[in-house]
Every structure is written in structure tokens, then in C-alpha cells.
């Protein structure tokens, strides 16, 4: 009976596949996509947008009220900025935009988010409406775990692209906005925007086009100071600073002069000024984080010791403010054609020339900082040594060329990387700077100092002095100007350094400048300052690791001794050769291993587990420095000599 039942049970199962085949559903097909948001047109938008931002200091929220003029009913698409100039990436803060409501004549107007382009909101405008009133909040990070903190009970750092919706279909320069900001009682502000009126705590600014608004951040604070960096000049330049505490704004006279020198040296380097006024916006704070370039201003976040104890903050003084200022010429006035976008959403940015936009700016930032006196010649050389050593040791240069790293802002958007040493990340800054040092020293050598990269900067960025209308360029324009300075195979020079891996010419500029990279067992003051700022101890060029004071491993060099021993970031060093870990103990162990030739034993803690690893490393402590090359002119000193 059991056997008969089993056979009967199997019969319909055996017959099932044939029946099922006859009734199979049709093959899957892709769903129809919604119509794409139309490309922007270079025509003016009728009317003026009124935009008002009110900070909620207790909750780190920016409240936005916007009035958008409309004509006639029908479909309208509103866009929240996605591609942010200066970040080179689609990192618009759409996830932090909340509470959107739209009304017309007091009645609610429904909206629908585009299911593909989530930065777009579709609205059916009522036929009778003359304007739409929009209300929403930008929920700024409350802690650094969520992102850069831009608001405290004493500081508010406002970037307008986080607080505006704009109509699709228009170039940003065709949309006019009248911005306003509700200034907390007792606060002051700095911005490139020009004040039109003030009443009841609300500051209303003169109308500007949307592209200018997005390019004009506002820094406000309870503790505020403003300094004239170009006294008596026809083109005003100021430094506007907000701070955690009033004492953080005490600047020494010689330090103020060094910042004034940045303005003077930059104008000489570029033989032009492409703004009608400029404001360095500075947040002197250990609580907030900021930094971005703009055409008539710059955002600069610095530690609370920046003015009061410059020796503690050597690291950020090596390039930061001159770098962001240089972007007014390199990146804002003259902009790579594929990075210029008519709006902030529909036309994506591409960064194929970031080695000019950021790489040459990085170079000039370091050079101008030295020329101005923000850093000493020794600090400049130490920074250069650190850069050269870091890139020389970087394993990722063996598989990935410099040109490909210009895609990183889109690929990664500065998210943390497990193995940055192997993957690489935005190396067009530092390796780009070394490439431009290479070009500078080559021009100086071949012309017997009759020309230099400053000559290039004056020709390339110095056109149309006084204009701040963007002028775009392509690779051939860069090559053409270099050839006008000194005829050479500049296309080959650049493409060799951009497209090969590894780039064996990495240190050519340093050596042609009359110096060479060497390693000793002494760490430079600049390196110590950088480590102190990050609260780590660097053994990058010896064991191939960086550790915090408590032994937590922050980074491991791909393929280095620590890597070969099985270490990675995230583990902790508990003991060194049987003694509790501290940086001095590890340093001593590295030194002793040179003589004893005995592997260095580390007790490693990872989660709930412990293990001991032995690292057979016997080459001692290694820290980078520059050493003079006899018989080669000291072109490096010529490069950082102040311009007259």
C-alpha cells in the first residue's frame, strides 16, 4: 500500500514540468522609466526668488522659507542641488533635506519626488497661482559621526546650496534670488554677499543669480572679528573669523602681516584679481568643520590655536588659506570645461583636469604660504619631503595611474577607505603638486631662471584682469600656454606623468630643485605637529603602520612589514617585546632590532582575541627629509623667495 501511494504521489509531479512550461509567464522586461528632467536653457527665469534662512541653534537645523514666482498653471519641476562646485561630486545633501511643504494662496500643493532623479520634485501648479511658498529644513549634522558639523550655539556656517530649491530648465545664472538670513541676537557675520537692508534681526542681501548665491557662503557667530588684508588697495580683501571663544581671535601683528602677504604675493603670482572684493571666511573652532573654495570668498576651518599659538598649528598653515585663495584664479575664474556645469543637477561634472584645478593649486598654496611667511623655508622643505616619501611608498601607484584618480570624487566622495594605500584617493592634489614642481624647475633650468611656472600662472590665469566671468579651458590650452613660456614636449611631459604607473619621474622636480629625499631616525617638527593634530604616532616608513597613543592601529601600509605580519587597521597593539605599548617603547624596539637582528614582537588585540606577531624588520626608524645636492642650483629657495 505504501508503494502504491508513493507512485500515485509521484505521477502528477512527473507530469508537472511539461504543464508548467506551457503556462510560463512572459520573460521579465525593464519597467518604463519616467521622463528625464529636461536640460537647462540659457534663458532668464521670470521673477525673483525670495529665500530666507533661519537657524535653530538648539537643534542644528536651518529652517528655509522660499517664495517662488510662477506664471500660469501646469507642471513644474523643482531641483535640490546635487553637483556641488568645488566638491567635484554629486554630494548634494538630499538626505538631510526634510519637511517640504508647498502652498499657493494658502492652499496645499502636492508634490511628487522623481523615482529616478531623487533630487527632483514634480509639482502641478494651480492655474490661478502667482507664486509658490516653499518651506523645508536642512538637518545639519549634530555630531561628526553624521558629517561636518556646521552649527553650534555660537557658530553657524551657511552654504546656500543646502537651503534652496530652484526651477528646472534654466541655467543657474538665469535665476535671480534675493537671500535673507535671520541673524541671532548679538551675532555678526561675514560673506561675499552685499547687505541691502537689516531689520528685526533679519539681514537681507542684494539680489544675485543662483550661481553666485551658491558660490557665496555665510559665516555667522557670537564671537566675530574682521581684518583688512589689503589696506589702501582698490580691490578690498578681508578676513572674517568666527570662533568658539573670544580669546581665539587674538591675532599677533606679525601673523596678520603674513596673511596680508598672502594677498600681495597671490596678486603678483597671478598678475590679476578676478573679483571686486574677497572675503576669507574662517571658522576658528574645534567643534565645527569646513573648507571650500569660492570665487569671491573661501571657507577655512582651523583649530582654536591657529591665531593664538601658530607653532601648534604648523600643519594647516603650510597651505590652507593660500590654497583656497588661489582657487579664485585656478578653478573658479579659469575652470576646466568638463567641470563647468550650467546648473547643479542635470549636467554632471567631470574631473579630467583636476591635476590642474587642484594639483597646481596645491603647489601654489604651499609656495605662496612660504613666500608670505606663513611657513618657514624649513617647513616648506619638510612638507615637500613628507609628500614625496608618502607617494613613493604608496603601493597603489603600481597599478593605478594619476589620471584615473581624478574620478575619485565621483567614485568615493571621501568616504573612509579600508586600504587607501592600495586603492589611492584623490592623489591629483599631492602628486599633482610634485608634477608642477617638476615643470617649474624644468622651465627654470632650461631658461636659466628667465621664466618659471609663475610666468605660466600670469599668462594662463592673468587674462582679463578684473573679470570674474568664468573662462573654461581644455588640456590643449594648458599645453599651449606652457609652450608659450618655454617650447617643449609638454603634452608628452604631462601624459607620461599622468598615465603611467608607477610614475618614475615622481621625485624629478625635487632633485632638479637641488635637493634629494633622504631618511633619518629624526622626525621633523612639521611631521610631529601633523601627528599631534591627528593624535597618532607615525611608523609609516619603518614598520609600515600608524598608531594612536592607546595602541589602536589607524593605518597599515599595503605590503609593508606590519602588513606581512598580518596587521590591519582596527587592531590594537597591547605590548611590545613583552612591555606595555606606548610610542616610545615601540620606537626603542625598532632601534634595538637594528643591532640584535631579533624580530619585534607585538601582542595584538582584535575584538575578543589576542595573538602575538613577530616582525622581522631591522632598518631602524625612518623619517623623510630633504638634503642638498652638491653642484645643483638651489632652485627651491628661488621658488619660495617673495615676489617683488
Model-derived features: positions:
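Ligand-binding face of N-terminal immunoglobulin V-set domains in extracellular IgSF glycoproteins
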Residues: 65, 75-80
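Sec/Tat signal peptide C-region and signal peptidase I cleavage site
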Residues: 16-22
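N-terminal, polar/Ser/Thr-rich
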Residues: 23-57
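Positively charged n-region of N-terminal signal peptides that target proteins for export
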Residues: 1-4
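C-terminal recognition in membrane/secretory proteostasis and scaffolding
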Residues: 365-366, 375-644
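Juxtacatalytic substrate-recognition/specificity segment
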Residues: 66, 228-354, 360, 364
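Non-catalytic architectural context of zinc metalloproteases
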Residues: 23, 41-44, 56, 65-67, ...
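Bacterial N-terminal signal peptides
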Residues: 6-16
Amino acid at each position: 500500500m505504501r508503494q502504491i501511494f508513493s507512485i500515485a504521489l509521484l505521477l502528477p509531479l512527473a507530469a508537472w514540468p511539461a504543464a508548467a512550461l506551457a503556462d510560463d509567464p512572459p520573460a521579465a522586461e525593464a519597467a518604463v522609466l519616467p521622463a528625464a528632467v529636461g536640460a537647462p536653457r540659457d534663458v532668464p527665469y521670470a521673477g525673483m526668488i525670495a529665500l530666507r534662512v533661519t537657524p535653530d541653534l538648539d537643534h542644528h537645523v536651518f529652517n528655509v522659507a522660499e517664495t517662488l514666482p510662477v506664471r500660469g498653471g501646469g507642471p513644474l519641476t523643482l531641483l535640490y542641488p546635487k553637483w556641488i562646485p568645488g566638491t567635484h561630486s554629486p554630494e548634494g545633501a538630499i538626505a538631510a533635506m526634510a519637511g517640504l511643504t508647498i502652498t499657493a494662496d494658502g492652499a496645499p500643493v502636492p508634490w511628487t519626488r522623481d523615482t529616478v532623479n531623487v533630487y527632483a520634485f514634480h509639482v502641478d501648479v494651480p492655474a490661478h497661482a502667482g507664486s509658490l511658498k516653499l518651506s523645508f529644513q536642512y538637518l545639519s549634522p549634530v555630531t561628526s559621526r553624521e558629517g561636518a558639523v556646521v552649527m553650534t550655539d555660537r557658530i553657524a556656517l551657511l552654504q546656500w546650496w543646502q537651503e534652496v530649491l530652484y526651477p528646472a530648465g534654466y541655467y543657474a545664472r538665469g535665476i535671480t534670488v534675493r537671500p535673507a538670513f535671520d541673524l541671532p541676537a548679538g551675532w555678526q557675520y561675514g560673506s561675499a554677499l552685499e547687505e541691502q537692508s537689516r531689520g528685526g534681526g533679519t539681514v537681507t542681501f542684494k539680489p544675485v543669480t543662483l550661481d553666485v548665491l551658491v558660490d557665496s557662503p555665510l559665516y555667522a557667530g557670537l564671537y566675530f572679528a574682521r581684518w583688512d588684508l589689503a589696506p589702501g588697495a582698490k580691490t578690498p580683501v578681508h578676513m572674517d573669523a568666527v570662533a568658539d571663544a573670544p580669546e581665539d581671535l587674538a591675532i599677533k601683528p606679525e601673523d596678520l602681516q603674513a596673511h596680508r602677504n598672502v594677498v600681495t604675493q597671490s596678486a603678483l603670482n597671478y598678475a590679476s584679481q578676478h573679483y571686486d572684493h574677497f572675503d576669507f571666511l574662517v571658522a576658528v573652532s574645534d567643534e565645527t568643520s569646513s573648507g571650500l573654495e569660492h570665487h569671491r570668498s573661501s571657507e577655512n576651518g582651523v583649530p582654536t590655536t591657529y591665531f593664538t599659538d601658530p607653532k601648534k598649528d604648523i600643519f594647516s598653515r603650510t597651505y590652507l588659506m593660500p590654497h583656497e585663495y588661489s582657487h579664485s584664479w585656478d578653478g573658479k575664474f579659469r575652470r576646466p570645461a568638463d567641470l563647468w556645469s550650467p546648473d547643479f543637477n542635470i549636467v554632471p561634472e567631470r574631473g579630467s583636469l583636476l591635476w590642474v584645478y587642484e594639483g597646481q593649486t596645491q603647489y601654489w598654496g604651499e609656495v605662496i604660504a612660504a613666500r608670505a611667511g606663513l611657513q618657514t623655508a624649513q617647513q616648506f622643505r619638510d612638507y615637500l619631503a613628507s609628500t614625496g616619501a608618502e607617494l613613493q611608498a604608496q603601493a597603489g601607484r603600481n597599478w593605478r595611474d594619476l589620471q584615473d584618480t581624478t574620478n575619485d570624487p565621483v567614485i568615493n566622495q571621501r568616504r573612509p577607505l579600508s586600504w587607501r594605500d592600495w586603492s589611492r584617493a584623490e592623489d591629483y592634489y599631492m602628486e599633482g603638486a610634485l608634477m608642477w614642481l617638476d615643470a617649474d624647475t624644468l622651465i627654470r633650468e632650461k631658461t636659466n631662471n628667465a621664466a618659471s611656472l609663475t610666468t605660466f600662472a600670469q599668462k594662463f590665469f592673468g587674462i582679463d584682469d578684473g573679470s570674474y566671468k568664468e573662462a573654461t579651458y581644455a588640456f590643449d590650452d594648458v599645453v599651449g600656454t606652457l609652450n608659450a613660456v618655454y617650447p617643449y614636449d609638454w603634452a608628452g611631459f604631462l601624459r607620461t606623468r599622468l598615465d603611467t604607473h608607477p610614475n618614475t619621474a615622481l621625485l624629478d622636480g625635487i632633485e632638479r630643485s637641488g635637493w634629494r629625499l633622504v631618511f633619518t631616525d629624526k622626525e621633523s617638527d612639521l611631521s610631529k605637529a601633523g601627528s599631534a593634530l591627528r593624535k597618532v604616532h607615525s611608523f609609516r616608513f619603518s614598520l609600515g603602520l600608524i598608531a594612536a597613543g592607546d595602541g589602536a592601529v589607524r593605518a597599515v601600509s599595503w605590503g609593508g612589514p606590519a602588513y606581512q605580519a598580518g596587521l590591519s587597521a582596527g587592531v590594537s597593539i597591547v605590548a611590545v617585546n613583552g612591555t606595555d605599548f606606548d610610542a616610545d617603547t615601540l620606537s626603542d624596539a625598532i632601534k634595538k632590532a637594528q643591532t640584535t637582528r631579533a624580530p619585534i614582537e607585538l601582542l595584538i588585540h582584535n575584538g575578543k582575541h589576542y595573538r602575538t606577531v613577530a616582525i622581522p624588520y631591522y632598518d631602524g626608524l625612518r623619517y623623510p627629509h630633504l638634503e642638498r645636492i652638491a653642484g645643483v642650483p638651489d632652485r627651491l629657495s628661488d621658488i619660495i623667495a617673495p615676489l617683488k
